[in-house]
């Protein structure tokens, strides 16, 4: 999975990015999520962890980070345990904010015109 951060324009509602000047787009690698997106269109939602905390590896791990019960589909087999790579393309040069499943080398191989910060 890959999350791409871009500069937000005036078409991005305040409630989507809390008024920040950037917005993130996550490209999932999950059959059920891709099917849902195909049927309903784009989805908007936060990460399933508290900012700065490690991502849960099981639904119960995710639920334990929050102080209330969370509705959801418990499908622990679908969790890979590997976070998405966060690629920031909002500046002059690309930056990887979090290394995940997709490496900088793979990005450069597939899209050689992307220039990274040193």
Mark where each language-model region is.
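Active-site-adjacent structural elements in enzyme catalytic cores
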Residues: 1-118
